[in-house]
A protein has these predicted regions:
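Tandem repeat scaffolds
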Residues: 1-95
Length: 95
């Protein structure tokens, strides 16, 4: 995830706990069984992405753009969605 731009990638079983990975762009990406808890994704952009069975507890999303993002069966405890960029904000949640 070190690159700044990611398009049509699948991230599986990635452990990025307590990491600072802000100012990244993700388009049409899938995150499966990833642990991103307590990481900082501030000022990043997620467009048409899916998070499936991921742990996103306490993830920081300040100024982050979420457009067409699906969270399916994810742990989302403590995420401050109100701090996200509200322009075209569009998220869906499934169990």
């Amino acid at each position: 995830m070190e690159n700044l731009i990611h398009v049509q990638k699948t991230f599986e079983k990635i452990v990025y706990v307590d990491k600072k990975v802000n100012n990244r762009e993700f388009e049409d990406c899938v995150f499966k069984n990833c642990d991103l808890s307590n990481s900082d994704f501030s000022y990043s952009s997620f467009m048409d992405c899916e998070f499936i069975d991921c742990n996103l507890a306490m993830t920081k999303l300040s100024g982050t753009s979420l457009k067409g993002v699906l969270f399916k069966n994810c742990k989302l405890l403590g995420i401050q969605f109100e701090e996200c960029d509200d322009f075209l904000f569009n998220v869906n949640f499934e169990e």
